[in-house]
Amino acid sequence: MKVKAVFINKPGEVETRWVDYPHKKENEVLIKVDAAGICGSDIGAFRGTNPLVTYPRIIGHEVTGIVLQEGTGMPDNIKKGDRVIVDPYIYCGHCYPCSVGRTNCCENLNVIGVHIDGAMQEVVTHPAHLIHKIPDNVPSEMAPLAEPLTIALHALHRANVKAGEYVAIIGAGAIGLMAALSARHYKATPILIDIVEERLRYAQKLGVPYVLNAAD
């Protein structure tokens, strides 16, 4: 049996190809993909500007789907048939960064769609402990945004943002917008900086109080 997958063969060359149906290991789950986001790093892979990507590569790390087969180590609140989002950062759990909770800095980190094949294919396997259940009130097509949201929240947490503070955020792309809107939930005041006026106007429509065009 075969499934379709999105490959970047080399910079500037993308195609849909048939690949073998994945067979999971005991500690993996099998997931039927139903939505995937296109990240800036995917665009970088296509353009050849992402130095971490090797080719050919199945892209995709902002991915949601339905659990087809369960695996050992799966969170207790998840079962076959549930909608899940994957954590694309596969860490070893044994190195020093992992031992202090900085799994994103794992010395042996593998990011799906970057270092190893990703999830822009009809059916994928993924480590069973690295999936999260999607709340019933979140549409599948919106759920992939949870991954870039975690990037924005991580930045706010690392900066130790507190209520009443002003927060300068450089870049009004998806993650910058999420950081600005999240800062408001922390009762902080975001100042969003970009050189694309259209992005800044859109940010204002979303409720970002202060924007600055750095090209002015």
Protein language model regions, located:
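Mid-domain Rossmann-like dinucleotide-binding core that forms the NAD(H)/NADP(H) cofactor-binding site
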Residues: 138-216
